[in-house]
Amino acid sequence: CDMESKAKPFCYKAQVIETSRLCAKQLELKEDEWGISFQSRIGPGWIQPFTDKELVRLAKEGIKNLDVVCPAFVTDNLETLEEMNIRGRETFLEAGGNSFNYIPCLNDEESWVDFLVNASKR
């Protein structure tokens, strides 16, 4: 599913697409300045495009500098720290990229914690 519907109100892929779109809009990125991929694949049926393949493709297409954020996660974990910040970085740089800037998750950012506290009081 590429968008939420009554039949699939909690579609992970649709939520990731919408969250990413909203982040790109807030950052005033043009359509060709951002993209989406999916990591931590479990078998061949996982959601595509696969992050490792996209990192190679981007480097081969001449993208030299990459900023990476994982908006599906609110805290860093093995998937973000090891898969993205370590292996993803290595994959991109080995494929020809020059810089890989991993942007950490919200983690314990004060404004995020304040939001959670206020939301839990409702």
Regions found by a protein language model. Name each.
Residues 1-122:
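Extended amphipathic ligand-handling, pore-lining, and cofactor/metal-binding catalytic surfaces
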